[in-house]
Amino acid sequence: PCRYDDFCILLRGRGDFAVYEAALRTAGIPVFADTAADLLDEPHIRPFAALLRVIDNPAQDIPLAAVLLSPMFPYTADDLVTLRGACPEGSLYGAVLYGGQPRFAPFLETLAEFRRLARTLPVDALLEELLARTGYLAAVGALPEGARCREDLQSFCAWAASAGRTGLPGVIRAMDAARQNGGLTQNTGGQT
């Protein structure tokens, strides 16, 4: 009898791997990929990276929407549609500030606290505090392949802590530089 680990799919390039990976996962077949991945593009890293951007500057609509819709906060797409219906003009942050009461009041309080922490804590302590207060590390651990996702998030936090020696703005600049230079590459080399 054959086992899953008796088979190997070799591809000429990495570009098509996502299609194969999705098809194999859909069929319930475990997939091992030895690829270099952009950590910043991982679906379980993007919300946390967006949170850092929003703490640094909340007037960024796309990161703010990503944070509001993430497992860190209890909002849905319907909440954002309702908010936009009430405040169709201006930025999303302006709508949250002026049209989102009382539904978004807890978010605004949390964001104010996170921004205060960002001004007073070193980045490594800030990251630990954010993970603890949002429960995001636990949420990521509950995903399929949670152990790998947790490991990725911890790797991202270690990278951000070293990049953020000058504070949160340093982390944001480092993320932007990594994006311009092709991403934050990490060898995932595990179950995917």
Task: State where each predicted segment sits.
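Conserved motor-region signature of P-loop NTPase helicases/translocases
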Residues: 1-70, 74-81, 95, 109, ...
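Amphipathic, charged-and-aliphatic alpha-helical interface segments
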Residues: 83-90
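Alpha-helix boundary/N-cap detector
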Residues: 99-102
